[in-house]
Amino acid sequence: MSERGEFKTTYGAPMPPYETADDAYRAAVERLGAPGEPPFTRGVRPTMYRGRLWTMRQYAGFGSAEESNARYRYLLSQGQTGLSVAFDLPTQMGFDADDPRAEGEVGKVGVSISSIDDFALLLKDIPLDQVTTSMTINATAAILLGMYVAVAKRQGVPLTRVGGTTQNDILKEYIARGTYIYPPRQSMRLVTDVIAYCAEQLPRWNPISISGYHIREAGADAVQELAFTFANAIAYVGAAVERGLPVDAFAAQLSFFFAANATLIEEVAKFRAARRIWERIMRERFGASDPASLALRFHTQTMGSTLTAQQPRNNIVRTAIEALAAVLGGTQSLHTNAYDEALALPSEESARIALRTQQLIAEESGVAETVDPLGGAYLVEKLTADIETRTLAELDRIDAQGGALAGIERGYQQRAIEDSAYRYQREVETKARVIVGVNAFQTEGDETKITTLRVDESVAARQRERLVALRKRRDAARVGRLRADLRSAAEGTANLMPAIVAAVDGDVTLGEICADLRASFGAYVPPDRG
């Protein structure tokens, strides 16, 4: 009987009809190791989910700080175990809500934060010594972390008990997402300032979440996702070491963020290969010796780009498959997308279903009862080894460019992602890749009539009014001194975090801080790549 077609991985390798225990398989199994031990192929903890489930961390944020705070408290009441904050585009790009460049975007794709007042409202009645918070923020990460620190101090929480993560991965913004402000080398200074500050002041805070997720969503395949992410990670670790930080003093605080696609077996292999690659990088390139420095800890999010506006309830199934891949792959925390996200921000109902998807996997599927349940499977082990080999080869190519930063400046990673995205789209258009409800199994009068969340259009006006009131009541002379101190620090070489924390606590706004840093650092203009 003939086969249905040609079967390949997302990165173009042929998928065999079946696998056997040949020499390649036996070699792969010999390198496995035990869970919780280098090279961590089988997981970063000996008991994995038998000891503690992954953190269920739903990404949320919209409109005003008050509205987002209500959503966070609702999710926590429904069993969520950590917060994940989405910020609107003006906040990500360094503009206050009353800046003309923020017009039409305030509160639309995340929560609007311009000042410490907004941030205090965002975290109202949420005890920061009991809940960890992940903040998806990059160009303005140092400022938002400064606000978090200031609010924690106001709550009376010792910084040694404050836990969470700032994404703070600016390099991937230049190749995959675009929310950059300053040139790459000046941005790298801010990243390393945050790493150094956290190593000294915030021992439970992950100063960076090096993100393959956005690279994958931009069109990269599984191998490119790992290779470009690890190339960025090598650049960050190298920069921190050059600043005089011993690698074992901060490496255990590094975290990662990956995508989970619906290609379940390939994704499980990808996550397992990632742990093995990172252990090797830290041991061989940087001489790390603390096992905690060698262990890859990562958050996973199901892929937004796989969600369809057509037949949107199918997305519940897509997300469940992707979430299962993340769990089988040993993620430390997980966000499951809501089924309506191809149409709007998640409604309360869709957010609850997304959270329940994780809870069903955790409590009813049985996959959390055994560590690395797919370990030893012929296909899984050989795919793990194949992805590892191909990723290391791609890292060699990036090294030949001069590393991640030089590659970005030459456009190497950007071109590779664009080419991969084009190949994927051609497969969809030619139906070589089936997307249920999009290019196959369509229905007439698609069932897109679902209730979606709409952001209150008055949010922008209320945010502007709040800023007017802030500027009237604050101590203008103190604000002037704090901004002068920040500019002086930016012109020098000292860590900027103390000046930023002081500025936000003294009612200097996010937009004002970014304006001062733009004046010192300049603004990044991407090269014309023709």
Language model features by range: what are they?
Residues 159, 190, 345, 527-530:
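Catalytic or ion-translocation cores adjacent to nucleophile or general acid/base/metal-coordination motifs
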Residues 62, 71-78, 116-126, 147-151, ...:
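Generic, well-ordered alpha-helical scaffold segments in large soluble proteins
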Residues 5-17, 21-24, 37-40, 89, ...:
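Flexible, glycine-rich loop/tail regions that form catalytic "lids" or insertion modules at the edges
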Residues 114, 132, 137-140, 152-154, ...:
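Phosphate/diphosphate-binding loops
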Residues 66-69, 113-116, 142, 185-192, ...:
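Electropositive phosphate-/nucleotide-binding environments in soluble metabolic enzymes
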Residues 246-250, 288-302, 310-337, 346-371, ...:
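Flexible glycine/proline-rich, aromatic-decorated loop/lid segments
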Residues 1-261, 266, 285, 292-299, ...:
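Catalytic alpha/beta active-site cores
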Residues 103-108, 172-182, 215-220, 258-263, ...:
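Short beta-alpha connecting loops at secondary-structure transitions
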